[in-house]
Amino acid sequence: MRRKLPIIIIVGVLLVALAGGALMMRPSESSRPNLAQMPPTTTGTDNTSGLNSNAPVASRPAAANIAPIVHLRGRADAPLLLEEYGDFQCPPCGFFHPILKRIEGEFEREVRVSFHHYPLRNMHRNAAEAARAAEAAALQGKFWQMHDMLFEKQKEWSDAPAARPVFLGYARTLGLDVEKFTQDIDSTPVSNRVMNDETVGTARGVTGTPTVFLNGREVPYEVITNYDRLRAAIESEIAAKK
């Protein structure tokens, strides 16, 4: 019995040590990444290869003779233009949406917002159709209403095997002519509008979403995913214009 006692003690010590190590290796709640720490959703390719990132959009061959379809919200005399290249199915874009809404509310007189489509077709199966849904709504004067609904209800349709019925439901909720909406969502003009945005975005160096420009200059991702940082960047731009 005396010979077995040291062995039992040694085994007990080893078990305690292993348990302690396991607890140390388990990530704490504070160490888990939150959505704000998510990287932007990217195409996985470098769309700017061979291009001068400082060159104006007009000088880039891919954007030649293409007038981007611009959806604007805000005062026409606002001194700042904030442009978003977004994908309605992109989770970081969904996270950015309420941040942008707060910015619009706080800087109503100073900031005008523009949205450009950049659906990541190879990653998000419903993204391109969502972009067309927004454009079909735009033909009935309700682009921004559909834009907001798509982001705010992103989880409802993002992984749906067939998103069309969901989008038709949104059209009804917004009071759209559903028959016209159904025709427009698959029309060539609507598809071309989305592709025009993608082409111009690629020419500007966009490779992921959300990508945001403030008065023509790209805003770092770590800034746009933090309300206080984005607010400070806007205040700095406003001060520079005084």
Regions found by a protein language model. Give the residues of each.
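C-terminal cap of thioredoxin/glutaredoxin-like
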Residues: 1-40, 168-242
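Juxtamembrane proline-rich low-complexity "stalk" or linker regions positioned immediately after a signal peptide
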Residues: 31-62
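Short, surface-exposed alpha-helical recognition segments that flank or form part
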Residues: 57-58, 91, 185
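A short beta-strand-turn-helix
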Residues: 63-80, 105
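A generic local structural motif
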Residues: 67-70, 99-100, 198-200
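Short clusters of hydrophobic/aromatic residues that line enzyme substrate/ligand-binding pockets
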Residues: 72-73, 157, 219
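Alpha-helix initiation/capping motif
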Residues: 75, 122-123, 160, 183, ...
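Structural alpha/beta surface segment adjacent to cysteine/selenocysteine redox centers
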Residues: 78, 83-89, 94-172, 177, ...
